[in-house]
């Protein structure tokens, strides 16, 4: 079964958690976009929800599918955030940020009563780190920050991190996030202690946020061959 089909199964299963009257955090990325299309169909059938988008792209896809949006600063409560992930381990720790939306995704996830993560089975890992860890940094002094990120990762137990500035598709200009920052992609191979990496990176002034999501996801829905497997903490 293709990854697309598995993502669709996971997104469809996530709809079971949605009820009328909810304000939803709307994640970013390919699986989140599938969810938005399915959510739009439910809204046409009478489901009454509104969403807080975590990226300009998500806002665009939501609007195209008839999902009502509300400004994040006009929200009192976010019931559920529904998002994808680049990696998920057995403790529901995540790596996110392949789509460069990690800061806003984390803000919304932290503000939500529940975070649901939808993935295809290829995203399940025993140990985080095969997927490069994105670190969002201020553009001012980013080269200095990159050096500090490298040293922090080594102190946190990453043997040979490779820290690279993410660039646009042309490979020339640096990619700029919706918030106006740069992304450092940190190839780690394995992250034995996500908490240590979290603490080390947060101590660097130039680091805005990083793609480790710890103690946030409480439901992981995995699209597998012919079905969706729901795991809850």
Curated annotation (Swiss-Prot):
Pathway: Carbohydrate degradation; pentose phosphate pathway; D-ribose 5-phosphate from D-ribulose 5-phosphate (non-oxidative stage): step 1/1. Pfam families: Rib_5-P_isom_A. GO terms for molecular function: ribose-5-phosphate isomerase activity. Its EC number is 5.3.1.6. The active site is at 105 (proton acceptor). Substrate binds at residues 28-31, 83-86, 96-99, 123. InterPro entries: NagB/RpiA_transferase-like, Ribose-5P_isomerase, Ribose5P_isomerase_typA_subgr, Ribose5P_isomerase_type_A. The keyword Isomerase applies. Keywords: Isomerase. It catalyses: aldehydo-D-ribose 5-phosphate = D-ribulose 5-phosphate. GO terms for biological process: pentose-phosphate shunt, non-oxidative branch. Belongs to the ribose 5-phosphate isomerase family. Homodimer. Catalyzes the reversible conversion of ribose-5-phosphate to ribulose 5-phosphate. This is Ribose-5-phosphate isomerase A. It comes from Maricaulis maris (strain MCS10) (Caulobacter maris).
């Amino acid at each position: 079964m293709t990854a697309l089909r598995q993502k669709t199964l996971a997104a469809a299963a996530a709809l079971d958690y949605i009820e009328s009257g909810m304000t939803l955090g709307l994640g970013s990325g390919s699986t989140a976009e599938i969810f938005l299309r399915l959510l739009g169909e439910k809204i046409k059938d009478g489901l009454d929800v509104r969403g807080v988008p975590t990226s300009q792209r998500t806002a665009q896809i939501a609007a195209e599918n008839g999902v009502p949006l509300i400004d994040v600063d006009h929200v009192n409560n976010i019931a559920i955030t529904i998002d994808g992930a680049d990696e998920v381990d057995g403790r529901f720790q995540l790596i996110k940020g392949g789509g460069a939306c990690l800061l806003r995704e984390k803000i919304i996830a932290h503000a939500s009563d529940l975070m649901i993560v939808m993935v295809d089975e290829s995203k399940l890992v025993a140990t985080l780190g095969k997927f490069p860890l994105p670190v969002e940094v201020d553009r001012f002094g980013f080269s200095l920050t990159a050096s500090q990120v490298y040293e922090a990762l080594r102190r946190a137990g990453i043997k040979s991190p490779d820290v690279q500035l993410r660039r646009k598709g042309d490979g020339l200009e640096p990619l700029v996030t919706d918030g106006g920052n740069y992304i450092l992609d940190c190839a780690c191979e394995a992250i034995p202690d996500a908490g240590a990496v979290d603490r080390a990176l947060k101590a660097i002034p130039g680091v805005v946020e990083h793609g480790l999501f710890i103690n946030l996801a409480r439901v992981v829905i995995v699209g597998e061959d012919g079905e969706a497997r729901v795991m809850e903490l």
